[in-house]
Regions:
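Conserved small/polar residues in nucleotide/adenosyl-binding loops
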Residues: 505-510
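Non-catalytic, conformational "gating/processing" segments within enzyme and secreted inhibitor domains
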Residues: 167, 181, 218-250, 466-467
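M16/MPP (pitrilysin/insulinase) zinc-metallopeptidase core fold and M16-derived inactive scaffolds
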Residues: 60-132, 183, 200-206, 321-354
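An aromatic/glycine/proline-enriched structural segment found at the starts
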Residues: 232-288, 397, 401-406, 490-504
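Mature N-terminal segment immediately following signal peptide/propeptide cleavage
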Residues: 30-60
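Bacterial Sec-dependent N-terminal signal peptides
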Residues: 1-26
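M16/insulysin-pitrilysin zinc metalloprotease superfamily fold
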Residues: 90, 131-165, 330, 348-408, ...
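Acidic/histidine-enriched alpha-helical segments
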Residues: 99-105, 157-175, 240, 259-273, ...
Length: 510
């Protein structure tokens, strides 16, 4: 492991000196778990195949697509999600008419239940279909599931009659999802993402489009975006990898590579100097809540498979963990200033092209101002004074304990755990070196990263610009909320808050 140690010390040097500088440094590429077969067909289709016998005689089939509602044209709003529904309503090999069973009835005759084992979801930037817990006793069932993936990839029928039938189903889903928080989110997006495609991108889409779109609009979306260079197949279970790979190559051989394909754009999110603040109320909302986001650049996909990435993710995780511990302790007070509070880090709300450190709180009906002030004070305390050695020792020990537990349980990993890892690798280039490598790496990395490095990272995550605020609360007579101007003023006051270093959270665990 000498090469790993050398790379680690370089990474820590950069990390401790300058968090942003790390992003630009070339680092050793991490290996890929040798237990998964990864390949790419000539048409651009990527596949991941792994043998795993937990549970025995079962296998998972997934197809992940690098497409979602963000790619819709204005006249197609909601059709990415509509297409997901149509994938179950007739395909080339499972027509669902007098010539043969559809996917859902065929699967249910084999014990594969719709909703439980057969399902899909559409989000802003991805669409994923799955057939789970498939019995491997019958070879023809396994082969047919592979054929279903093929049809989802390139052979959904999209018959006029079936499209019209599905409009009613989508209308009902649209109405059921039209909750108070959904309405607030829809109204908040243009404020959070001004002049951006993200301003109108929720997958449920437009009811007017759902009711009236011409058939060709959904066929155009399907032809343009469902294509092998944007698709990944994940097959994990009690199967022979060589045999499954050969079958996959044969089944997908007729799927053509696109000619002059449209560019798959990942839309950027603009920076902002002044806070972007949205305040929304709705009669269906029961309790007030407020979220503060501090935006930062997303870690480049091209650099994720490096020690840098693991080091930075570890440090951010430690900072978030320790801040959450402080918030949890405040919540245990006799008369806490909020009913709940938490910190986190990840994609900026619905956009994967920007990251954000976030802190949020919920409160009693008349307590949002106190909750807001408290979480900003704790955020500023973490930025200004950092965390203590005792806090860090506790958080690091818990982290390493979780890593060790995962390592010790590595022979008991279930199929879906591996599938989710491969989906993340395909869609977001998340590394997958395997738990053995991660265990060795983190047991060298974590003990050598000091709390000072964590504190420096927190200073850079909690920014004076790129701030976004979302306040949601009940629409009730007599209930008052802080104004946008008051929230903006409080953010500007953060650095001048009268605070002392944290003394409440330094006692060791019993």
């Amino acid at each position: 492991m000498k090469h790993l140690l050398r790379g680690f010390f370089i990474a820590v040097l950069y990390i401790c000196c300058n968090f942003q500088l790390v992003l630009a440094q070339p680092m050793q590429t991490l290996p890929v778990d040798k237990n998964v077969r990864i390949g790419k067909l000539d048409n651009g289709l990527t596949y991941y195949i792994r043998h795993n016998a937990l549970p025995e005689k079962r296998v998972e089939f997934h197809i992940a697509q690098k497409v979602g509602s963000i790619l819709e044209e204005p006249q197609q709003r909601g059709l990415a999600h509509f297409l997901e529904h149509m994938a179950f309503n007739g395909t080339k090999n499972f027509p669902g008419d007098e010539t043969g069973l559809g996917i859902v009835p065929w699967c249910e005759t084999k014990g594969i239940k719709f909703g439980t084992n057969l399902n899909a979801y559409t989000s802003i930037d991805k669409t994923v279909y799955r057939i789970s817990n498939v019995p491997t006793d019958n070879v023809s069932v396994v082969d047919s599931c592979l054929l279903i993936l093929h049809d989802w990839s390139s052979a959904i029928n999209l018959a006029d009659k079936e499209i019209d039938k599905e409009r009613g189903v989508i209308r009902e889903e649209w109405r059921s999802r039209n909750s108070g928080m959904q309405r607030i989110m829809t109204n908040a997006l243009p404020v959070m993402y001004p002049d951006s495609k993200y301003a109108d991108c929720m997958p449920i889409g437009s009811l007017d489009v759902i009711n009236n779109f011409p058939y060709q609009d959904i066929r155009d979306y399907y032809a343009k975006w469902y294509r092998p260079d944007l698709q990944g197949i994940m097959i994990v279970g009690d199967i022979n990898v060589d045999e499954m790979e050969a079958k996959l190559k044969k089944v997908f051989a007729d799927v053509k590579a696109p000619v002059n394909p449209a560019e798959r754009i990942y839309y950027p999110v603009a920076d902002n100097q002044e806070p972007q603040i949205f305040i929304g109320t709705d009669k269906e909302i029961e309790t007030p809540s407020i979220s503060f986001f501090f935006k930062s650049e997303a870690f480049p996909d091209s650099l994720k498979n490096t020690i840098n990435y693991y080091g930075i993710q570890y440090m951010i995780s430690m900072g978030v963990t320790m801040l959450n511990s402080r918030l949890a302790e405040i919540r245990q007070q006799a008369n806490p200033p909020f009913t709940g509070a938490s910190a986190g880090y990840g994609d900026f709300f619905v956009a994967k092209t920007k990251n954000a450190f976030g802190v949020d709180a919920s409160s009693k009906i008349d307590g949002i101002e106190l909750a807001m002030k408290t979480i900003l004070e704790e955020t500023e305390r973490a930025r200004r004074f950092g965390f203590t050695e005792t806090e860090y020792d506790r958080a690091r020990a818990n982290y390493l304990q979780r890593v060790e537990s995962a390592y010790n349980e590595r022979e008991k990993m279930k199929n879906d755990t591996y599938v989710n890892e491969y989906i993340s690798n395909f869609l977001d280039n998340e590394p997958m070196p395997g738990i053995e490598y991660e265990y060795a790496m983190m047991n060298q990395l974590a003990p050598n990263i000091p709390v000072a490095a964590i504190n420096q990272v927190m200073q850079q995550l909690i920014t004076d610009n790129n701030q976004v605020v979302l306040l949601a609360g009940p629409e009730k007579e007599g209930v008052k909320y802080p104004t946008k101007e008051e929230i903006a003023a409080l953010l500007k006051q953060m650095k001048s808050f009268d605070l002392k270093p944290c003394l409440l959270y330094t006692s060791p665990s019993p």
